[in-house]
């Protein structure tokens, strides 16, 4: 048997054929830009987080009296421990940067539209799982911001009618954030990344069922090429750029994206003057704080994800790509600026004028989802020459 025949025989095996179908011979639109490379970057970030997390867990002790010291032990005594911790801590930030860019690319090019509704909804579920995983991971170092962040955020569950207080008690494992809480969060933080892997594989499988969107938003079965080697090489450029960007944070600014109060051991008797979550939670945190009522704030956070989940089902879009929708382009860039403003508001004190700015910014955020179905009706349709080949329902 020749080498070529051996290769073909190997690719016909069950597992190999699946990998070949989805990672090598997958038919890809030939006009994809670098904005379509953030999906593979997100996968790389997830692998980095799992690998570094497994090694960190070998030296971490989930106990309120030992957790903070075990983190310092990793930093000071474990060979390469400082690198593992900085890769894991900054890797979370890189993961969210990549995913946020991935989401905004999907919004700009309307990648959520038919027939990719399920792909988008799975992506929203993955995003929600990421938020939960990152939050409980932020608690594990058991510094001041870890402890008080856990206390404030978990207590929000008490806003749920009837069962809220029961849920909070279950989350805490008692009547306050304590050792039981830390143990539960450590177990969940170890488990959830593997659930994320499963959800990501479902996301990929759902995407490949109908194929990738493209910058023009026009579906064509003819103008496609194999994923390998063309888009591997194109993605490689993004991977190298990401590695350089990631390395700068690890080696030159490893603590810039964190909070200095988390280098102080948790003290239940001393409340920090300003409780701030990690930067990637700040836009959502700003929406939460903009509403004085606890129930209203929790409802607003739930509404954020409901809006994202409902977006694909507004079947009112003649043209997918924003390249041909100048009005939507302007609204999109307004949304992006608004999210950046919400991020800045989230780290400011709860006082005037920041509260008012946060309320206005939150209103603008939700108005985007309210007017998107209307904007879908504004503009010219797809040319008749593409009607037979294009799905623009």
From Swiss-Prot:
Keywords: Electron transport, Heme, Iron, Membrane, Metal-binding, Mitochondrion, Mitochondrion inner membrane, Respiratory chain, Transmembrane, Transmembrane helix, Transport, Ubiquinone. First mitochondrial-encoded protein to be shown to have its N-terminal methionine cleaved off. GO terms for molecular function: metal ion binding; ubiquinol-cytochrome-c reductase activity. The chain crosses the membrane at residues 38-58, 82-104, 119-139, 185-205, 231-251, 295-315, 327-347, 354-373. It is found in: Mitochondrion inner membrane. CDD domains: cytochrome_b_C (cd00290), Cytochrome_b_N (cd00284). Gene3D superfamilies: Cytochrome Bc1 Complex, Chain C. Pfam families: Cytochrom_B_C, Cytochrome_B. This is Cytochrome b. Binds 2 heme b groups non-covalently. PANTHER family: CYTOCHROME B. Heme 1 (or BL or b562) is low-potential and absorbs at about 562 nm, and heme 2 (or BH or b566) is high-potential and absorbs at about 566 nm. GO terms for cellular component: membrane; mitochondrial inner membrane; respiratory chain complex III. It is a multi-pass membrane protein.
